[in-house]
């Protein structure tokens, strides 16, 4: 399983978890309310709370329960098999997500802790699924030597930017920021970059080798401390910009010994192919559930 695919799965899992939590909270909060309560009217006709909750359960009930089962299955079997994941292992994979894959975004819905919890879950799941697969040290070293770019990164800067049409407006932006306005809010309101403005101007982690990033951004970022923004407008091809440095990561290369367990899981998961799914563990965990027969086939 390719590295970028793994992070896509993590991203998808986090999204599903957000939906599941929202659904569970909504249903629990509604427990004390009347099921016949009208929560909306359309042309004089009501939508009742009961109808709404049924629709929510039809759409999310099965997937929510399945996610809850999956987490418990992995936790129980990991404990049974005495699998333990170190904090350093989770931190390393999280660092690679940020710097190499540029996939990390933290917002009000998904925090750094939630990312790390999902990474820990994925590592445990992959360890369980691949526990009976042996990969020689020679094969692991060969993979590492052929794919070193997956385990190293240059100095990286997580940058936000606000792009406006002219220098005058850029200076107005600076006044707003100095007056206490948040960078994210001003970016959402003023930036002409429609791809990043909904995300507070977040460009993710960039390096000197990044495509489509003005070299002036990198040079300015080198002079800034985290959370500081540029004090003068930066001339760019489509106007003027103000940037903010959110985080800086120093260049690093992980050694073979540091990542060999991760490589073993990657190769073993590739060998499993479509069989690499948590549902293959349900029978071992003796699962029975509302939507199906006991355990799975």
Swiss-Prot record:
Show the GO MF annotations: peptidyl-prolyl cis-trans isomerase activity
The residues covered by the PpiC domain are 154-247
What is the name of this protein?
Answer: Putative peptidyl-prolyl cis-trans isomerase YacD
| One Pfam assignment | Rotamase_2
Protein keywords: Isomerase, Rotamase, Signal
Signal peptide range in chain numbering: 1-32
**Recorded name of the encoding gene:** yacD
Source superkingdom: Bacteria
Q: Does the UniProt entry include the keyword 4Fe-4S?
A: no
Which Enzyme Commission number(s) are listed? 5.2.1.8
Q: Does the keyword DNA repair apply?
A: no
User: Known catalysed reaction(s)?
Assistant: [protein]-peptidylproline (omega=180) = [protein]-peptidylproline (omega=0)
Q: Which SUPFAM superfamilies match?
A: FKBP-like, Triger factor/SurA peptide-binding domain-like
């Amino acid at each position: 399983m390719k590295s970028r695919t793994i992070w896509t799965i993590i991203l998808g899992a986090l999204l599903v978890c957000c939906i599941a939590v929202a659904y569970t909270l909504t249903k629990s909060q509604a427990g004390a309310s009347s099921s016949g309560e009208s929560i909306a009217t359309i042309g004089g006709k009501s939508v009742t709370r009961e109808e709404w909750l049924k629709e929510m359960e039809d759409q999310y009930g099965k997937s929510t329960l399945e996610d809850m089962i999956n987490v418990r299955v992995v936790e129980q079997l990991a404990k049974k098999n005495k699998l333990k994941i170190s904090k350093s292992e989770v931190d390393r994979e999280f660092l690679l997500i940020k710097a190499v894959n540029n996939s990390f975004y933290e917002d009000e819905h998904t925090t750094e802790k939630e990312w790390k919890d999902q990474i820990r879950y994925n590592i445990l799941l992959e360890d369980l699924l691949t526990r009976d697969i042996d990969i020689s040290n020679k094969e692991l070293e060969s993979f590492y030597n052929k794919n070193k770019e997956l385990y190293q990164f240059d100095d990286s800067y997580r940058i936000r930017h606000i792009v406006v049409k002219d220098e005058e407006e850029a200076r107005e932006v600076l006044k707003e920021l100095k007056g206490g306005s948040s960078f994210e809010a001003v970016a959402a309101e003023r930036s002409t970059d429609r791809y990043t403005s909904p995300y507070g101007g977040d460009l993710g982690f960039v390096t000197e080798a990044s495509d489509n990033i003005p070299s002036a951004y990198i040079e300015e970022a080198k002079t800034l401390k985290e959370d500081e923004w540029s004090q003068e407008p930066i001339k760019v091809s489509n106007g003027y910009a103000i940037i903010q440095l959110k985080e800086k990561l120093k260049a690093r290369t992980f050694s073979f010994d540091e990542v060999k367990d991760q490589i073993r899981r990657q190769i073993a998961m590739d060998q499993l192919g479509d069989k690499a799914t948590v549902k293959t563990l349900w029978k071992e965990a003796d699962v029975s559930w509302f939507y199906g027969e006991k355990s799975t086939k």
